[in-house]
Amino acid sequence: MSSMDNTMKFNVNEEPVSVDVQEVLMSVYEALEEKGYNPINQIVGYLLSGDPAYIPRHKDARTLIRKLERDELIEELVKSYLSQHRKSLE
């Protein structure tokens, strides 16, 4: 059996996040909107690639988003989505 057939376990550090993820995402979203970008596309591009060039320097958005690890951002997005939609799945 190849390693591609095995499920890998991903463990997230349970350290408290010193930066508020929601606050960062909202600030970055607003900065992207102000610059005329599609905020969702740009944030997804950043999350998938890790390339900060997807996020403008406008309003320090690039600096803000880089204060968080991408896995922390993704974890918060998944938690938020599931907490809002879980009842509709049951």
From Swiss-Prot:
It comes from the Bacteria. InterPro entries: IreB. It holds the Pfam family IreB. Belongs to the UPF0297 family. HAMAP family: UPF0297 (MF_01507). This is UPF0297 protein BH1268. It comes from Halalkalibacterium halodurans (strain ATCC BAA-125 / DSM 18197 / FERM 7344 / JCM 9153 / C-125) (Bacillus halodurans).
